[in-house]
C-alpha cells in the first residue's frame, strides 16, 4: 500500500509487519521532503513513526480517541489521516497546521500547542465516556519532556485514583523535549532505560535468539512473552513510581519495533483501569543529521536534504532580538555574579543557550514548568539574587497567578523577558504572543516595557536589573532593526519616560515596542500626501509617560496608538483610560490585533490580514480622521474593513 492511498487510519488493520515497515519508510520520506522545503518540526515526528502505526493498528479510529501532547510529534498522524496530499501546505497560510486542530480533521480530537495537556484531556474524555455509558478507548501520547510539566503530573495523580476508568497513557521517551529534559523525573526515566538487566534482555538475549540457525532471524510469540516475563522479574523497580500512583506499568519497550509495541498496546487495552506504556524512541530516527543533533533538528527552517544544512537566506539579516538579549545578558552576568538566567526548557529559543555555554553556573533550566520558574525566581530574589526569567509570551500565560501572587504583590526584583511577543507566524494561534500586553499591564508593582530596536533592548535590560522591583520586557520574534550595537557600557533608561522620534502637527502616533518602526514608516506614507505625523516611542506600558503624551495629544488633537498585541485591555486601552481620567476627550484610533485568533501564516501575511502594514495603517488613519491629503495613498483598497478601531 502506498501512503497516498491511506486516507483512513483503520486501513492499517491487517497489514503485515513488513507492510507497516514500508509505510513507515514512506512516512519518513514524505515528512523529510515537506519539512526540508517549507520548514517545521522535524525530529519529534521522525521519532514516533512506528509508535503511531503500532498504536493505530490496535484502535478503531472511527470510535477511539487519541490525544497527542503538544502536537509537534503528530506529523505521522496527519499523514495517515487524510492529509498526505495537502501536506505540502504545512504551516502555510490556509494550509495544514503545524499542530493539531479540531477544526482541521475529525481525527484531531484535541488541539494543542503547549505541553503537558494530553493526559488531562484524555482523562476528561474517558470520564465523559463512562458517565454516558459509552464504549471507546481514550489514549494520551506524551513525551518525557512534557511529563515534567506539573499539569501532567496532576493528571496522573487524578487518573491513578480512578481504578475503574480505562485510560492508556503512552510515554514517548526519547530523552528529549526540545532541549534535553531536566530534573529528578528525567533522571529516573534515564535510569530505567539504562538499567543493566533491561539492556541485557533487550540486547544480548534477543540478539542471541535471533541468531539461532532455526529461528531465521525472527522471535516467536512464545519467546516474546518469556522475554516480557523475564523483564518484569529482572527489573522489578522499573515503573514503580507509576504503579505506586495507581497505574499498571508496561515497559520500557523499543519504540521502533512495531510488533512488540502492537502486542503491548493490545495487552494494555485489556486492562480495566489506567495504564502507562513506556516506549523508548530516538528523536530524529531515520535521518542521520537529526539523530546526531536532536536539539538543532527539533524544528528547522527550510534545509538541504542531502547535506542537512539550512538554505542560505536571500538577504543577510541582523541578529535576532533573542540573540542580542542572550549576548547582552552574558556581559551583565560577568559584571554581577548575582544575576542568574532562568528558562523553562526553551534555552535555544530565548537566547539563553548563549549564557548556558558561557556561564553555566549562572544558568538554570527548570524544564517545562513555567509556574515553578516564576516562583523559583521569586525565592531567589528574596535572598539576594537577580533572576532574569526568559519565557515565550504565550507560555508565560501559564504562570499568571505566580506573576501576581509570588512576584507582584511582594514587589520582588525579578526580570521577565517575554520572547516571541506579538505575531510569530507559522506556529499559529497557540503560539501568537498577542496577550501579554493585556495581562502584564494589569499587575500592580510591575514596570513593563518594550524596545523599539535591539540597541534599546540592551539599555532596557540594564534598566530592569537596576530597578528595585519586578520588571517585564517584551521582545518580538525574528531579526532586529540592524542598528549599531554597543559591546558594553549601556546606560539605564529613566523609568516611565518615552521619547519623541518624529515631529509633526497633524496626527500623533504613540507606538509601543516593535510597532515604532512601523509607525515611522506609516508617518512617511502620510507625509508623502501632505500629512505631518508626530511619533512617540512610548517605551513603557507601566508607567505610561503621561507627561509626554498628554500635552502633545492636546496640542495636535488627533491621537493614534499602535501595538503588536490584543486591543482588548492593551496599550491603546491604557492610553485611552489615561486620557479619560484627566478629562481629555481627544479623537483617537487604536490599532492592534482585534478580537480574533491569528492563524498560521508568515508574519507578513498575518500583518496584512490584520491591517498592520504601514500603508494599510496610513489609509486607516486618513479615513478615521477624514484627513485631507494632497494625493492618493497607495494600496488604499487593501485596508481591511474587518479590523476594529476605537474612538
Swiss-Prot record:
Mg(2+) binds at residues 144, 174. SMART domains: Transket_pyr (SM00861). Pathway: Metabolic intermediate biosynthesis; 1-deoxy-D-xylulose 5-phosphate biosynthesis; 1-deoxy-D-xylulose 5-phosphate from D-glyceraldehyde 3-phosphate and pyruvate: step 1/1. It catalyses: D-glyceraldehyde 3-phosphate + pyruvate + H(+) = 1-deoxy-D-xylulose 5-phosphate + CO2. Its EC number is 2.2.1.7. Binds 1 Mg(2+) ion per subunit. Binds 1 thiamine pyrophosphate per subunit. GO terms for biological process: 1-deoxy-D-xylulose 5-phosphate biosynthetic process; isopentenyl diphosphate biosynthetic process, methylerythritol 4-phosphate pathway; terpenoid biosynthetic process; thiamine biosynthetic process. PROSITE patterns: TRANSKETOLASE_1, TRANSKETOLASE_2. Thiamine diphosphate binds at residues 72, 113-115, 145-146, 174, 287, 370. Its cofactor is Mg(2+); thiamine diphosphate. GO terms for molecular function: 1-deoxy-D-xylulose-5-phosphate synthase activity; magnesium ion binding; thiamine pyrophosphate binding. It is an enzyme of class 2 (transferase). GO terms for cellular component: cytosol. Keywords: Isoprene biosynthesis, Magnesium, Metal-binding, Thiamine biosynthesis, Thiamine pyrophosphate, Transferase. Homodimer. Catalyzes the acyloin condensation reaction between C atoms 2 and 3 of pyruvate and glyceraldehyde 3-phosphate to yield 1-deoxy-D-xylulose-5-phosphate (DXP). Belongs to the transketolase family. DXPS subfamily. This is 1-deoxy-D-xylulose-5-phosphate synthase. It comes from Synechococcus sp. (strain CC9311).
